[in-house]
Regions:
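Basic polycationic patches enriched in arginine
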Residues: 6-9, 29
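SAM/dcSAM-binding transferase cores
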Residues: 28-78, 93-99, 265-314
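The AdoMet/dcAdoMet-binding core of the Class I SAM-like
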Residues: 24, 33-34, 38-41, 48, ...
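C-terminal substrate-binding/active-site "lid" region of AdoMet-derived donor-dependent transferases
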Residues: 214-277
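Alpha-helical subdomain
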Residues: 207, 211, 234-240, 250, ...
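A short, flexible beta-alpha/helix-coil linker loop
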Residues: 90-94, 202-205, 230
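Cysteine-centered motifs
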Residues: 2-5, 17, 22
């Protein structure tokens, strides 16, 4: 760490220090994006902000853009304990504990893992939206030998993957730059269709337009394996969430469960299997076993999911 300006050097980057700012300079790898690390103007003096900006940018102008909400790129804030990905200051898109990078910090990410109550050994998980990689990392560590494909449309989000300890691509794990809606259609043509499709596809304006139609949800249904599950994080205005819930219910013939979270997110599980009929006592036992293995409070999600089934939330 540079003691003069409190900026941490990043792996693969040399740092040219001045009395005002540290400017990261790519080292011999042109494909490595320039990540500018500055003292954060928002919180405490030990916080930093990471920006995808060139070394010769006007840093004061950039920070004013961030503060005003006009900045149109993702950025990362680090307080020494937690690292968060933002599309704006008003909303945390992803959060990572620096002590435990593979833990799920946000309630909605924990709730999205409730698909394991119904499908414990998926072979292939397709995730739409990388963010800080929280879901992908957790699945990589805790969901058996499942192959994980992550599709992210914004290369600027992918550029931060190392900041969030997202695993390198290997035989089980890969991150692809592309439109999630297009990849859902492609996956429907694969021999090994995904057992789980996780949808967390947001930009700074909310749910991506390409995943906001009945046709998209029909393509998800068609792409899933026979007993497959779609898990969707719906956030934003109540009317928008209700519209998505209605589309999902129509396509999946009301085989839908939901978890309403206090932060305004709705986590929706939709089941392709026409014979879907949950056995809640068995699911409760599964939840206890999963809690022991992963540390997540699956039993509380069983209660909420069963309640949504009884009340026919949609």
């Amino acid at each position: 760490t540079c003691m003069a300006c409190r900026v941490r050097r990043l792996p693969g980057l040399a740092v040219q220090c001045t009395p005002v700012v540290c400017l990261p300079i790519p080292v011999s790898r042109s494909e490595v994006p320039s990540i500018l690390v500055l003292p954060s103007p928002f919180f405490t003096e030990t916080d930093t902000i990471r920006l995808l900006e060139p070394e010769d940018c006007d840093t004061q102008w950039v920070l004013r853009q961030v503060l005003s909400g006009a900045y149109d790129k993702p950025f990362v804030i680090d307080d020494g304990t937690t690292r968060t990905l933002h599309f704006s200051l008003s909303l945390i898109q992803s959060s990572m504990s620096l002590k435990d990078p593979f833990a799920l910090e946000l309630d909605y990410t924990q709730a999205m893992m409730s698909f394991q109550l119904f499908l414990q050994r998926p072979q292939h998980i397709l995730t739409l939206g990388l963010g800080g990689g929280s879901l992908a990392k957790f699945c990589y560590r805790h969901v058996g030998s499942a192959r994980i494909t992550v599709v992210e449309i914004d290369p600027r989000v992918i550029a931060f993957r190392d900041e969030f300890d997202v695993p390198r691509d290997d035989a089980r794990f890969r991150v692809i730059e592309g439109d999630g809606a297009d990849w859902v259609i492609k996956s429907g043509e694969w021999d090994d269709k995904p057992d789980v499709i996780m949808m967390d596809a947001f930009d700074r304006h909310g749910l991506s337009g390409s995943v906001s139609s009945t046709a998209f949800y029909q393509s998800v249904y068609d792409a899933l394996a026979g007993r497959g599950v779609m898990v969707a994080n719906l956030a934003g205005e109540k009317d928008d969430r209700a519209e998505h819930l209605a589309m999902i219910s129509e396509v999946f013939d009301e085989r839908v469960l939901s978890i309403m979270l206090s932060d305004g997110n709705d986590i929706v599980l939709a089941f392709r299997n026409p014979s879907f009929n949950p056995r809640w006592r068995e699911i409760g036992n599964t939840a206890k076993a999963l809690r022991t293995r992963t540390g997540l409070d699956y039993p509380k999600y069983v209660q909420r999911l069963e309640r949504s089934r009884r009340l026919r939330y949609l």
